[in-house]
């Protein structure tokens, strides 16, 4: 990094190429790099081999990372990359980061990529999965009826979706 910085480079991509980091290691590494090189812009590129990519992105941003790499539906080699929809929701809700992403279009973009790539979106995929905003009759559905007793920021309308109910 020192040699590249001295030659004029100002932006660096720090990858977790093998997807082996966890949020604690990601935060420590990013914090060290941002402290050592406060004038540089660091991006983080996470792979999802341990299903930790979105959490690692959050850790990187909280530690000073200024850019992140994502993929629609997490599509990427091996276990994929950090899913755009998950990262958007996490960064907005947990790090109060503003982006120019129009959340109400994430579902449409995801289904377009699904149909063009042939890679199915799991029904329980956060934000964009078919069943994510479906409540089964019971405690959760009852909470919806009680003036959103079990309220959270992941409302289906935010993502251009509607709450559905199923008998189970």
Feature annotation, model-predicted:
Residues 12-14, 40-46, 68-70, 87:
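Hydrophobic faces of well-ordered beta-strands that scaffold small-molecule active sites
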Residues 76-106, 110:
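C-terminal helical cap(s) of enzyme catalytic domains, especially alpha/beta-barrels
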Residues 1, 15-19, 45-51, 73:
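Active-site beta-loop-alpha junctions enriched in small/polar residues
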Residues 96-168:
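A mid-to-C-terminal "edge-of-domain" accessory segment
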Residues 1-40, 58-65:
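Alpha/beta enzyme core
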Residues 50-55, 69:
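Short glycine/serine/threonine-rich phosphate/pyrophosphate-binding segments
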Residues 16, 63-80:
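Glycine-rich phosphate-binding active-site loops on the catalytic face of alpha/beta enzymes
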């Amino acid at each position: 990094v020192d040699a590249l910085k001295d030659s004029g480079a100002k932006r660096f991509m720090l990858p977790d190429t093998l997807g082996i980091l966890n949020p604690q290691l990601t935060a420590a590494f990013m914090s060290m790099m941002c402290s050592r090189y406060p004038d540089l812009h660091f991006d983080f590129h996470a792979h999802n081999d341990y299903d930790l990519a979105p959490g690692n992105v959050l850790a990187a941003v909280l530690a000073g990372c200024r850019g992140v790499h994502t993929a629609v539906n997490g599509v990427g080699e091996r276990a994929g990359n950090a899913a755009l929809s998950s990262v958007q929701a996490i960064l907005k809700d947990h790090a109060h980061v503003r982006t120019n992403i129009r959340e109400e279009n994430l579902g449409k973009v995801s289904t377009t990529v699904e149909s063009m790539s042939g890679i199915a979106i799991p029904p329980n995929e956060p934000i964009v999965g078919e069943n994510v905003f479906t409540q089964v009759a019971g405690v959760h559905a009852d909470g919806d009826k009680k003036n959103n007793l079990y309220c959270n920021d992941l409302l289906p309308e935010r993502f251009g979706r509607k709450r559905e109910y199923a008998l189970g």
